[in-house]
Amino acid sequence: MSKNSVIIVAAGKGKRMNSSISKQFLQIKNKPILYYTLSKFSAHESIDEIVLVTLEDKIEVCSDIIDKYNINKVSKIVPGGKERQDSVYNGLKAVSKDCEVVLIHDAARPFVTSDIIENGIRCANQYGAAACGVIPKDTIKIKNEKEFAIDTPNREDLFIVQTPQCFNYNIILDCHEKLKKHNKKVTDDTMVLENYGKSVYLYEGSYSNIKITTPEDLILGEQILEKLT
């Protein structure tokens, strides 16, 4: 029977947080951010396994969190690579061979909802590739190299991409292998497919599905958690 797998990418060092502790291990309400992220996917009935990708020297820390909070769907913890795309590729190689749909998610994005997960799986099955996100609330400007505004895109045409990003496993693995062969650099997994002419369906995420990257995000995260509990 085919599986739905999720790769949680927790290999970042979080330089923008100005902390010696990686952002996924910082705490909100006395629990690490990674706990909230893992527990959301572990509790979801459509998720069969979790592959956690982290820094090699943080594997034991992650294992302790998994054991402490009894997160039972983590099948493997694997070391990350030099860049995010290398970490994702390591995760793709580690998922079960009968995986059909794989979701790729930021460890520092702990407020993903059950609906976002379910819709991602559905859209990946239907379209082959999908990513959640939101329309920007602010007006966006395009600037030139001299810092002057040169254009104002229609907000309705813009989309702030979040995670999970969800794919047919064979499609995303094939594109990542091509990317590695051609030595191309990307900032997220939708770009991996776009590099090879594949379309990515965009579906509704949530303004609360934030990535905790800065100290200000940590404060906002506490407020979001207050509303959710």
From Swiss-Prot:
Q: What is this protein called?
A: 2-C-methyl-D-erythritol 4-phosphate cytidylyltransferase
Q: What does this protein do?
A: Catalyzes the formation of 4-diphosphocytidyl-2-C-methyl-D-erythritol from CTP and 2-C-methyl-D-erythritol 4-phosphate (MEP).
Which classification does the entry list for the species?
Bacteria, Bacillati, Bacillota, Clostridia, Eubacteriales
* Molecular functions per Gene Ontology: 2-C-methyl-D-erythritol 4-phosphate cytidylyltransferase activity
Reaction(s) the record says it catalyses: 2-C-methyl-D-erythritol 4-phosphate + CTP + H(+) = 4-CDP-2-C-methyl-D-erythritol + diphosphate
- Which residues are the signal sequence here? none
EC code: 2.7.7.60
Task: Tell me the keywords, alphabetical order.
Answer: Isoprene biosynthesis, Nucleotidyltransferase, Transferase
CDD domains attached here?
CDP-ME_synthetase
